[in-house]
From Swiss-Prot:
Catalytic activity: a tRNA precursor + 2 CTP + ATP = a tRNA with a 3' CCA end + 3 diphosphate; a tRNA with a 3' CCA end + 2 CTP + ATP = a tRNA with a 3' CCACCA end + 3 diphosphate
Role this protein plays: Catalyzes the addition and repair of the essential 3'-terminal CCA sequence in tRNAs without using a nucleic acid template. Adds these three nucleotides in the order of C, C, and A to the tRNA nucleotide-73, using CTP and ATP as substrates and producing inorganic pyrophosphate. tRNA 3'-terminal CCA addition is required both for tRNA processing and repair. Also involved in tRNA surveillance by mediating tandem CCA addition to generate a CCACCA at the 3' terminus of unstable tRNAs. While stable tRNAs receive only 3'-terminal CCA, unstable tRNAs are marked with CCACCA and rapidly degraded.
Pfam families linked to this entry: HD (PF01966), PolyA_pol (PF01743), PolyA_pol_RNAbd (PF12627)
Protein's recorded name: Multifunctional CCA protein
Gene transcribed to yield this protein: cca
Length: 410
């Protein structure tokens, strides 16, 4: 029985990056032997065990064979006879197909160290094309390591195109797709993830609503980058630079979907694109069974982001309606995330990344002014029901009028 450290832990150590999760592979052992040593079984599809002391995962060396469509269409074989090299050959990229023995020696049968030096993301074998999930994984690794100069090997990108064209991506479960997408959006360069999916044809299969934005022009006066797809990439880049949470990044990815529906005759203007985009945002959210907080914010950002850009011009009653749309009195964080997403949208324009966005402070101040209105004096007057609601609305409107006047004097 031999135990090897494998995958990301080996890769990240060689890159000089922090090692967080450690995976182990066990060669020459059976499930019975693992149980006898106190390991606890946790694998549903293949033999994976938790170490009795550390709780880390130890998997028996295994091979896999394509037996159906999609990510789950594989038959696994684990036995003491499976070698380390056979186990490593089933992995996606050469940089993930390295192992380290108990003496710290690196076992590298597929050139992972050379590809690390060359900053190359390259597949291990033609079997790469059997698993559609690997398209998303490689795009995610590209987003993670773009800052280190990594690029995808041409032959690997060709296999990714082959997978996209095969229709296999449609066999991925919504949950598995969302897991990869959400992880990728939180990488240092999330825009690279979307760019790679666009380049290999996978974006058209997975999120055609975003794919449709590439090549759609916007007014150069407001968007020097012109191309709407390029704008979305720039907005995601700003999200990463400003360390925005997943909900904001997801909303920013989808905020301009309505522009993909504008007829060419109306280009480069996109009148009412916000309202047109809402059904598309809903469809994408449902397709991937996106968590509720991300769904809600994406929908609201899509519908109201131009309100944020025009915040300084909004009348107090329009501003009050905006705050009520976000239920800002009970859910202030959602409004704060909306403001953040709108600012990322404004900054995601070529040459305007550093421009001030006074709308952010203005909107947050307006929310604070409206939330500061207390219902207590109105209740003490004996108001209740609809009458109380109307009185509270008038008080909040008065507070916003005073706020706007005060800001106008500043």
């Amino acid at each position: 029985m031999q135990i090897y450290k494998v995958g990301g832990a080996v890769r990240d150590r060689l890159l000089g990056r922090p090692v967080t999760d450690i995976d182990w592979v066990v060669v020459g052992a059976s499930s019975d032997e693992m149980l006898a040593r106190g390991y606890r079984p946790v694998g549903a599809d293949f033999p994976v065990f938790l170490h009795p002391q550390s709780g880390e995962e130890y998997a028996l060396a295994r091979t896999e064979r394509k037996s159906g469509r999609g990510y789950g269409g594989f038959t696994f074989h684990a036995s003491p006879e499976v070698t380390l090299e056979e186990d490593l050959t089933r992995r996606d990229l050469t940089i993930n197909a390295m192992a380290e023995d108990e003496q710290g020696r690196v076992i590298d049968p597929y050139g992972g160290q050379a590809d690390l030096e060359a900053r190359l993301l390259r597949h291990v074998s033609p079997a790469f094309a059997e698993d559609p999930l690997r398209v998303l994984r490689v795009a995610r690794f590209a987003a993670r390591y773009a800052g280190l100069g990594f690029r995808i090997a041409a032959e690997t990108l060709a296999l990714m195109r082959q997978l996209a064209e095969s229709g296999e991506l449609q066999a991925l479960t919504p949950e598995r797709s969302w897991k990869e997408i959400s992880r990728a959006l939180m990488e240092p360069n999330p825009e690279v993830f979307i760019q790679v999916l666009h380049d290999c044809g996978a974006l058209a299969e997975l999120i055609p609503e975003v794919e449709a934005l590439f090549g759609v022009p916007q007014p150069a006066a407001h968007h020097p980058e012109i191309d709407t797809g390029v704008h979305v990439l720039s907005v995601l880049q700003q999200c990463a630079r400003h360390r925005q949470p997943l909900s904001v990044r997801w909303a920013c990815l989808l905020h301009d979907l309505g522009k993909g529906l504008t007829s060419e005759a109306d280009w480069p203007r996109h009148i009412a694109h916000e309202a047109r985009g809402v059904p598309l945002i809903d469809a994408v959210n449902q397709r991937f069974r996106v968590p509720r907080d991300c769904q809600e914010l994406a929908r609201l950002v899509g519908e109201y982001h131009t309100h944020a850009h025009r915040a300084l011009e909004l009348r107090p009653n329009t501003l009050l309606e905006l705050l009520q749309s976000f239920d800002v009195y009970r859910r202030p964080q959602r409004f704060e995330e909306f403001v953040a997403a709108s600012e990322m949208d404004a900054r995601g324009r070529l040459g305007l990344e550093q421009r001030d966005y006074p709308q952010a402070a203005y909107l947050l101040g307006a929310a604070q002014a409206a939330r500061a209105v207390s219902v207590k004096p109105l209740v003490e007057k004996g108001l209740k029901g609809a009458e109380l609601g109307e009185a509270l609305k008038r008080a909040r409107l008065a507070a916003l009028k005073a706020y706007k006047e005060e800001r106008g004097k500043a």
